[in-house]
Amino acid sequence: MKLRCPAAYGTSHVDDANMKKLRSRITTDGLDRAPHRAFMRAMGLDDAAIAKPMVGIVSMKGEQTPCNMTHDFQVAAAKTGIEEAGGTPREFSTVSVSDGISMNHEGMKFSLFSRELIADSIEAVVHGLAYDALIGYGGCDKTLPGVMMGMVRCNVPSIFIYGGSSLPGRVDGRTLTVLDSYEAVGSFMTGEIDSATLERIERACLPTIGACAGQFTANTMGMVSEAMGLTIPNVSMVPGVYAERAQISRRAGRLIMEMLERGGPLPRDIVTRKSLENGAAIVAATGGSTNAALHLPAIANEAGIAFTIDDVGEVFARTPLIGNLRPGGKYTAKDVHDIGGAAVVIQELIRTGHIDGNCITITGRTLAEEYGAANAPDGEVVYAASAPIMPDGGVAVLKGNLCPDGAVIKVAGLKSQFFEGVARVFEDEEACVAAVRDRSYKAGEVLVIRNEGPVGGPGMREMLGVTALIYGQGMGEKVALITDGRFSGATRGMCIGYVSPEAFVGGPLALVRDGDKIRIDATNRRMDMLVDEPELAARRRDWKPRPPRHRAGALAKYARLVGQAPGGAVTHEGPAEWPWFE
């Protein structure tokens, strides 16, 4: 059967096979699609453009954050590549909440929530407009997993592109990232630096647009996209302001058309248990963001794979730390790029059996084929796995009576992985920040911030503001901090987050009282409150749930839907199916 479109100049003929292959034909072909084509013509598309495959390009370009401001020229280059290869690019945008600007106030409740909004909005546009394929850009922290989740949910030929990091700053010969500005506030409070120095750091630490320069959440998830095979090989560490990024995007535009022609590989072909383990391995190997322990299960959920914080923790425990990267180490993303890129890490982990090189990538080739020619570790930025910085990874998942379903700590850079102290309980982040600003806390205390989990926050706020103050005051390893909220990828010190179950739903964190003794033993992956079980049982009987903080609006809807941290704090379970497009 052939369909004639008399409304189109030149008449379009599409047989059943192509109708099945190109989803967009449901919007472009046939007599009754004349109104649809009219809308397309109003956007400047001619007959030839309407007849070609429609490729969506999603980004967050805008003025919310410098992290996404590299997207503009990269998207333009991707459009060129698509057009050169015979496709019609269709650009659209989605939300982004700057983790930096929303930090340490109520706005941070929207950060993790925005990850779900991004995935949802990609699903809405790609399926709502029946695009044939997708190129998705990420920049600020939650945009990367949000886009990857959206890609896997839609399951059309897709390429993820990380927009790249900023260049590091310099003051007095010292390399800076934005973390230095957070910690400098604490240093100023103690008198270690003066206001002039604080201002110089503020003005110098982010000299260009692009995401934060250390191995914080954005760069971590950029590397994860490589280790999982969802992006063009060895591009994640190219700084966002480099002209090379235009070449990368133009290549992506051509490659997406090749993927569309051959029918894949599709995101759910790429996202497997093995590729998820590869993603977890590169997090551990580089001392990456603890947020990855939340994002990997969320990506897995979109593919229908049960991959929880326990699975992430197993990979963390068997993977050596070989990346000497900030915040636990010395170097930045640019330094990794200068020695050969993420390929150096990936190939070293493939060589030593910590990454499965047989996993497929978007190119149709395996990781081993794509990364086999990578440079060897330089021994300074990236160590050999046979002589690692640490033998068992820079991030750890803890269990114990305080976190029966798990908690996460970044151990990279810690002088000691053991801490025992007495609890000082705060019912929200603001109360703890006030105590730290007043310096009304002391060495040996375990600062407990609760009711900041996915439901209780709601939104599971990041605590970089308070952890950086503590570190800047020289107390980073003299106290511990525990929370059912999250940490920034830039957090360092004895900080344990993602405690689950969260306090708001009756998790053990809700039972902690001032003066309770708490033991943290990261070496043995344990965290416990040293309180007798009869006393804990009595506290459980007395515990009463708190009223929700939001009864209407977006956060109220989020709180009703969101799950706990071990499963990724997702708002639905399992893969979305669209049989209409199958």
Swiss-Prot record:
Pfam family, one: ILV_EDD_C
Any GO molecular function: 2 iron, 2 sulfur cluster binding
Cofactor entry: [2Fe-2S] cluster; Mg(2+)
Active-site positions on this chain: 488
Enzyme class: lyase
Residues that, per the record, bind Mg(2+): 99, 141-142, 462
Catalyzed reactions: (2R)-2,3-dihydroxy-3-methylbutanoate = 3-methyl-2-oxobutanoate + H2O; (2R,3R)-2,3-dihydroxy-3-methylpentanoate = (S)-3-methyl-2-oxopentanoate + H2O
UniProt-annotated binding residues for [2Fe-2S] cluster: 67, 140, 212
GO biological process, one term: L-valine biosynthetic process
Modified residues (N6-carboxylysine): 142
Oligomer and partners: Homodimer.
Record-stated family: Belongs to the IlvD/Edd family.
Protein name: Dihydroxy-acid dehydratase 3
Protein species of origin: Bradyrhizobium diazoefficiens (strain JCM 10833 / BCRC 13528 / IAM 13628 / NBRC 14792 / USDA 110)
Native organism taxonomy: Bacteria, Pseudomonadati, Pseudomonadota, Alphaproteobacteria, Hyphomicrobiales
